[in-house]
């Protein structure tokens, strides 16, 4: 019996060594020895959740800039702490007024969603409306974000009470005039915004492409007509806390929401409040992960902060989660935002594996597959594979950075957790993606 035990143990050990050798050879072939990654910093971790053992590791305990792979951690926090339906606001009715406590909900009046229960509630209110902002303790722009990207829609400012995704959506429509009176004036051009604004707007030179530029420190916009028949561009506005949002909401709502003073806040202390919910949490997380929506990610983390700490405090909630939920990570990460926009973020592939494993073991597998994009969807739309199921994962990319972490189905029909992080490369993201894709398809 003892001989049989040692024989089986030896076979299992040799089989494990053989598998690791095979994966090492494939990692060398497709990633580590490839000329496109010769100067890059690369980390690889492949983990079998069925026995909680690593199948392969290469520099997986090193720290990397994860870019949007941070959204995996934000997803974990949101699933753990946010209710099934997002908290839009807390509603407190006083004798002569209504006090609104914002919860950081990014879906309010966002064009992604058609129904907005909070807006309906505000519209039907018969008492004067007031809002508090003493639960906000976070900068509008994250630490380590690029200030040069202030005009880009992927870097909208964060706020306690977002409206319209904290973006102004601009539209250009060109059409041929039916009965032009001037042969040199045959085109009608209509440019408008959603929401409508009362901020300064000017016009720049006409160009081939419709373009809108906001002043860096002012909500003033310069529009350049394009030659497209129809075009659109979304531009972040300066939130000024919640002031800009309230200004935009005034026209949409037809009512003024005033900032609550200390006297009103004092009156509300002993009053019973109720929560107004908005969209389904998992719907927002799916959109966030499929298109890598930075605004949804950062606001989701702030909503988690409101649930845990009763205030929107990004540094504090990150420390709380690291201390109480992610204290078993093998290497302490540096985590600074919910989206991964910051280059200050640093995570190891081993840390990603740990979080992926927690997600898989805690939540329904079908839910995970709904939230994460698969090959051919969202940010994985360029990955092609004949199998109906091959990969569910999150990309992360910025200049010199490409990461991919998630779940991969091997040719033996086994789901594995994986994390591949590439930093300091000088190739294109598409080149790095194809190398990683080839490696994963070879497993």
Task: List where the protein language model places each region.
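Small-residue-rich helix-loop
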Residues: 55-57, 276, 301-443
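N-terminal post-signal-peptidase region of extra-cytosolic proteins
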Residues: 59-60, 112-115, 337-338
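Bacterial Sec-dependent N-terminal signal peptides
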Residues: 1-29
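Beta-lactamase-like hydrolase cores
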Residues: 18-63, 82-85, 120-127
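Short beta-strand scaffold segments in enzyme catalytic cores
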Residues: 44-46, 89-92, 405
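Short Pro/Gly-enriched beta-strand edge/turn motifs at strand-loop
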Residues: 26-29, 193-198, 385-392
């Amino acid at each position: 019996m003892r001989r049989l035990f040692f024989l089986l143990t030896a076979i299992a050990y040799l089989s494990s060594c053989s598998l690791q050798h095979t994966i090492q050879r494939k990692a060398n072939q497709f990633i580590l020895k490839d000329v496109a990654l010769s100067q890059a910093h690369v980390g690889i971790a492949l983990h079998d959740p069925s026995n909680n053992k690593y199948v392969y590791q290469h520099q997986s305990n090193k720290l990397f800039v994860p870019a949007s792979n941070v959204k995996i951690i934000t997803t974990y926090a949101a699933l753990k702490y946010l209710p099934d339906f997002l908290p839009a606001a807390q509603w407190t009715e006083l004798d002569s007024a209504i006090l609104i406590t914002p919860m950081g909900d990014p879906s309010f009046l966002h064009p992604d969603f058609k129904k907005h229960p909070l807006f309906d509630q505000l519209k039907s209110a018969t008492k004067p409306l007031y809002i508090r902002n003493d639960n906000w303790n976070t900068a509008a722009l994250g630490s380590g974000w690029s200030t040069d990207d202030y005009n880009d829609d992927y870097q909208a400012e964060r706020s306690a009470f977002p409206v319209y995704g904290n973006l102004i959506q601009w539209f250009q429509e060109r059409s041929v005039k039916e009965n032009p009176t001037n042969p040199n004036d045959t085109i009608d051009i209509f440019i408008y915004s959603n929401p409508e604004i009362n901020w300064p707007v000017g016009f720049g030179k006409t160009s081939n492409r419709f373009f809108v530029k906001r002043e860096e420190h002012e909500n003033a916009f310069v529009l350049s007509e394009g030659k497209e028949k129809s075009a659109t561009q979304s531009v972040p506005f300066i939130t000024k806390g919640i002031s800009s949002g309230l200004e935009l909401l005034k026209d949409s709502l037809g009512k003024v929401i005033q900032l609550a003073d200390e006297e009103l806040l004092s009156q509300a202390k002993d009053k019973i409040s109720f929560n107004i919910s908005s969209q389904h949490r998992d719907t927002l997380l799916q959109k966030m992960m499929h298109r890598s929506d930075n605004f949804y990610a950062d606001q989701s983390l702030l909503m988690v902060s409101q649930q845990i700490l009763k205030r929107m405090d990004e540094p504090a909630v990150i420390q709380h989660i690291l201390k109480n939920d992610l204290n078993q990570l093998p290497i302490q990460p540096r985590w600074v935002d919910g989206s991964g926009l910051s280059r200050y973020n640093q995570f190891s592939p081993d840390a990603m594996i740990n979080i992926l494993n927690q997600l898989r073991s805690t939540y329904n597998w079908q839910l995970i597959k709904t939230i994460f994009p698969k090959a051919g969807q969202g940010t994985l739309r360029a990955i092609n594979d004949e199998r109906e199921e091959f990969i569910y994962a999150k990309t992360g990319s910025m200049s010199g950075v490409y990461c991919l972490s998630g779940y991969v189905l091997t040719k033996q029909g086994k789901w594995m957790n994986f994390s591949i992080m590439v930093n300091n490369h000088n190739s294109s993201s598409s080149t790095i993606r194809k190398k990683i894709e080839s490696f994963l398809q070879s497993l």
